């Protein structure tokens, strides 16, 4: 359906933006965790950031496939 095709394009854009916002938050809190002396938590949050960036590459691929 045409409506579904339009909707999925809108959703992909939304998901990418939302994911990017989360990624930036993870880095902010990773720095705070490191400052508080919790290196283990900081490393995990950095990994979450990196995984979020990887997901955004998949969203980019989905966006290209959608067009």
Q: What do the predicted segments below correspond to?
A:
Residues 1-29:
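N-terminal acidic leader/helix
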């Amino acid at each position: 359906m045409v409506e579904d095709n339009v909707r999925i394009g809108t959703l992909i854009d939304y998901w990418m933006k939302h994911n990017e916002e989360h990624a930036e938050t993870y880095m902010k809190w990773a720095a705070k965790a490191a400052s508080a002396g919790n290196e283990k938590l900081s490393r995990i949050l950095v990994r979450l950031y990196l995984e979020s960036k990887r997901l955004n590459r998949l969203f980019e691929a989905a966006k290209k496939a959608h067009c």
